Amino acid sequence: MNSIYIYCISEKLDELVLTGINNLPIKVMQYNELSIIYSSINEEVKYIEENFFAHENVLDELLKIDVTILPFRFGTYINEEDVITILKEKYNIFIENIFFLKGRVEISVRAIWNYSNVLEKVKNNFVAPQIGISNEKINNYLNKKMEDYKLNESINQYATIEAEKIHKLILDNGIEGKYILMKTDSMFFNASYLVKKNKINDFSSRIQFVVSDFTEYKFLVTGPWPPYNFCNLLI
């Protein structure tokens, strides 16, 4: 049974002269106002660096020609005979996503903290809870457990407050975004923003404002990327 490896769904395209995973040629299948960008495969796609970068390169090339795409995650493939059925069944959802994402790209923003400094700052305002038990050994053990728990809770609360402040400063009219708290020893804020292509410079200026306002953190900004985090694709 033949399968196809899917890179993305896009606005209507005629053809693409590109190679993808396993050095396979890129093909275009049209359905009404949509195109599915794929490669025909008859073997398992290996999860190796070359294939991952080949997948990303196809999406990057499509971004360069200014076409709206709905990107699929690396490693997505289906039976060839199911393609048209899926396009028919989910056509309206795909069109809605295309319309929503038209003229926009995803930009990633990450905030990196010095965990030791944060820990010290939190400890300066931290009052350790006390449990009163007559058995000294058990009492000390429980107090230490409670202290560790409450301290971690305080750090999480601190990270949440800081992340929300950063997120609110970045958001502006026409920008949508979402973030997750990482709470690692290095990165605590990992966000994605959907930015209009003609507003990327404005977005960069806004990030510089945030950087100057939060000098205790380092910021890593990457993109533009295909809008992985802002399209609703389930096949």
Q: What name fits each language-model region?
A:
Residues 1-182, 186, 201-204, 208-235:
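Long, contiguous binding/interaction regions
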Residues 194-200:
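Helix N-cap motif at beta-to-alpha junctions
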Residues 152, 192-193:
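A short, structure-level motif marking secondary-structure boundaries and short turns
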Residues 188-190:
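Short, solvent-exposed beta-strand edge segments and adjacent coil->beta transition regions
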